[in-house]
């Protein structure tokens, strides 16, 4: 998998810190669980040992995934992001054209690894993100979501 992973500096640092914790603290805890389970004797019918080994497999997969993402990461500088169109790292103000009263919402488009809907950060790979990418102020967009179709007008594009 050679797809670039676009991250902010904070997003990169957060993933790097998570990897450090997994490789040191969590890996050590899992190895201790395996050693403890081994000490109980017969491994052929040792559910505790099997569970610890499964936890180790999952941990190593997560570590490998994070290492791969960090290797493929391109750190984006918000100061260099254009605001003529919607791109990754731009924020957009949208007017909901379906609402009875005026409803303005704001999203920031980020990578899947940094998405957090509670903070208004949506993935560029989400239905909303895909529909907004490349659009300009004044454009009207239709967005297919599981609940149906949404209609918005782009009011503003900016970088936070």
From Swiss-Prot:
Pfam families: GreA_GreB, GreA_GreB_N. The keyword Cell membrane does not apply. GO terms for biological process: DNA-templated transcription elongation; regulation of DNA-templated transcription elongation. GO terms for molecular function: DNA binding; RNA polymerase binding. Keywords: Coiled coil, DNA-binding, Transcription, Transcription regulation. SUPFAM superfamilies: FKBP-like, GreA transcript cleavage protein, N-terminal domain. Residues 43-76 form a coiled coil. InterPro entries: GreA/GreB_C_sf, TF_GreA/GreB_CS, Tscrpt_elong_fac_GreA, Tscrpt_elong_fac_GreA/B, Tscrpt_elong_fac_GreA/B_C, Tscrpt_elong_fac_GreA/B_fam, Tscrpt_elong_fac_GreA/B_N, Tscrpt_elong_fac_GreA/B_N_sf. It comes from the Bacteria. NCBIfam families: greA (TIGR01462), PRK00226.1-2 (NF001261), PRK00226.1-4 (NF001263). Belongs to the GreA/GreB family. Necessary for efficient RNA polymerase transcription elongation past template-encoded arresting sites. The arresting sites in DNA have the property of trapping a certain fraction of elongating RNA polymerases that pass through, resulting in locked ternary complexes. Cleavage of the nascent transcript by cleavage factors such as GreA or GreB allows the resumption of elongation from the new 3'terminus. GreA releases sequences of 2 to 3 nucleotides. This is Transcription elongation factor GreA. The gene is greA.
């Amino acid at each position: 998998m050679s797809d670039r992973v676009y991250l902010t500096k904070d997003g990169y640092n957060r993933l790097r810190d998570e990897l450090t914790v997994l490789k040191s603290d969590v890996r050590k805890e899992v190895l201790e669980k395996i050693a403890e389970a081994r000490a109980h004797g017969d491994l052929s019918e040792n559910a505790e040992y099997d569970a610890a080994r499964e936890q180790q497999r999952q941990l190593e997969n997560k570590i490998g995934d994070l290492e791969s993402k960090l290797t493929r990461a391109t750190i984006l500088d918000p100061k260099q992001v254009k605001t003529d169109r919607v791109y990754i790292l731009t924020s957009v103000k949208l007017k909901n054209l379906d609402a009875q009263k005026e409803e303005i919402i704001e999203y920031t488009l980020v990578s899947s690894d940094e998405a957090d809907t509670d903070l208004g950060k949506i993935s560029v790979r989400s239905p909303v993100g895909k529909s907004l990418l490349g659009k300009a102020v004044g454009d009207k967009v239709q967005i297919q979501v599981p609940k149906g179709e949404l209609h918005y007008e782009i009011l503003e594009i900016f970088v936070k």
